[in-house]
Amino acid sequence: MARMAAIGYSYGGSYSPDAKQIVFVSSGAGVPQVWRAVTDGVGLVQVTTFDDPVGGVLWSPAGEHLAVSVAPGGGLNTQIFLVPAQGGEPIQITEGGQVNNWLNEWSRDGRYLAYSSNAAGNGGMDCWLYDTESGAARMIAITDGIGSCQLSPDAQRAVVWRMQSRGNTNMYLLDLATSSEQLLTPHVGLALSNQAEFVNNDTLLLSTNIDREFVALARIDIAADGTPGPVNYIAGRDDADLDSFEMLADGKIALMWDAAGRSELAYLDLASGEVTAGPELPTEIAGGMDASPDRTMLTLSLSGSASPTNVWQLDTSSGVFTQISDSAHEGVDLDTLVRPELMTYTAHDGLELSGWLYRARVTGSTEGAPPMVLNFHGGPEGQS
């Protein structure tokens, strides 16, 4: 068990502007830090040497900076630093202390960094914008609880995501010049709206399950006067939730489905509406998709029953995966690990449920029950 618990991990790949390098977080040095690799998976170099663990990294589209989140003492009061991409001293841009801060995203020109912070002291994770030219940060949206934001290509608008309550979220269209907001996701009862991305300044894609059971991909068009239109579904499944999506070249969208706890990749052609299956993933679980600047390549954080979490690259044209990182697993022979079986069963109220069963390899005496581990997840939104 100790050897299993010590297995390393790498995740959160982010491309350089020329797509020749990828930065990511890895536990390879013991304390998680930022590492860099060229995109053929060789030449791994440790970039940061913080005393505290790094939680995430985003390479600026302008190329000059890495935005890095660091957790002092491994706690919740995460701080954000700008690390010179070509080497140099990190600059802390958040105030430190008991303030919590989360990375959101860079503007497409690399001037602004959007992040969430409770620095205002109102109890919520508000949306902030840091200007790399002036070195100043300003709050752009107030949130009572958990919140984040995504910027339009011209950085004149943003989508503000807010958690209303457990299992219930909303998105709002924010005009940064006037600070006015318009609700994008009106609904009755509970609904999850998880991810939003601007296709252009006037078109939004989002994942949501408003008026349906499973999360799907939807589109919202913004009129010339700034008024958002209705939620229009453009890709969905009756047996899987849309876990994440990423815009690709030639008007295509990469869709990552969660089908009974296993990830499945597909591609949507925005013009025709056709959805085609993507290549089979090297492992069972995928997360953290990020597209290269030319949107022909993807980084993914892949893990599985016999695979530590690693950063991979997918060439979307050829369908070829390349492993970028190599998470340590000393003393653990991955080939001997049990692969699970998908099992379905009926609950007491007749609802069909599913889960992954790991059958213990029984050696020696067969007397008595084999060893068993029960893994309970923490809420209705997640799966274990």
Model regions: which residues?
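Serine-hydrolase catalytic core recognition
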Residues: 288-384
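Alpha-helix N-cap/helix-start motif
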Residues: 56, 103, 123, 366-369, ...
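Short strand->helix junction
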Residues: 73, 100, 120, 363, ...
